[in-house]
């Protein structure tokens, strides 16, 4: 609240107090007519500090009006040390509502209430608070007549503080009190807190179990669909996140080697996937076809003969004819790199290439990426492992 607003409020007070001063005018005139003793004039009373006058004027107003004036003006009150003015708290927190109840029962009668003890976990303070509260109050019982309600936390029994005491000891103290029981209760939300805490623990346990099932399903999916076998199960979480990122970026399907494999079922199933590593790595061809029956591989070519002066080179189409129908099986062929041993000469190399064409069809082509595994490792920060560890054993 600004000083301008306070001055306006003081002017309103003076306007309302004007009629009262006019009614008291005769008394004041009589007082003026009375003789005054001779002598030096008395010193005038020192004016109070401006802050004291403001606080004295504010104490006469209702707190609601002060709150409204502060909200409208957007200002703050000047602070004064040692001031007796305090904001009144009309909405006391339920956790601070303590009450003392006295329960009286007959000789063959019970108090008519039930208690429970829960442990509330405080993660910030790393401790467990044991709270004993009233969970049920019977109708027309001494507890109900005394004003005991469900949800009241028991703070003391017969003047003895029971905070932190075990449940069995509290029950023994209540039973040993006789026909008169004096309880100090603290109303709070202990029941609701305990229920929510138990529910939270149950949901966490369920989430942990479901997460384990999800990880096992991810392992099976990666093994069946992509042929990946990794010892570290955390790699599957990374693969899933990378795949979702690639889907969101629009790179799949089609741009990566396994892009068409993850396409919709309505897409073309026939095709070939090829991933080529470095010069020291082997080359793998995995083909997926759709059809009724598998086709037998063409027979190996006859041994090479020295070409004569009038003979010509045997074309690859004669050695390996074109494939007939589509296959329904998936196969993986490992082809030795150039100079990789295993001999056979030019006809052996031609037969190997023709055999790859017979398996993978005419759609076999090399992707523009050197190694998909090397590209995938760029998306996985901190994963510095050799390529042999993630290599598929097909």
UniProtKB/Swiss-Prot annotation:
Pfam families: PDZ (PF00595). It is found in: Cytoplasm, Perinuclear region; Cell membrane; Postsynaptic cell membrane. Expressed in brain. Residues 100-189 form the PDZ domain. One of its GO terms (cellular component) is postsynaptic membrane. The modification Omega-N-methylarginine is found at residue 269. Its main location: cytoplasm. Residues 180-257 are annotated as: Interaction with PSCD3. It is a peripheral membrane protein. The modification Phosphothreonine is found at residue 76. CDD domains: PDZ_tamalin_CYTIP-like. The keyword Signal does not apply. GO terms for molecular function: identical protein binding; PDZ domain binding; small GTPase binding. Heteromer. Composed of TAMALIN, CYTH2 and at least one GRM1. Also interacts with CYTH3, GRM2, GRM3 and GRM5. This is General receptor for phosphoinositides 1-associated scaffold protein. The gene is Tamalin.
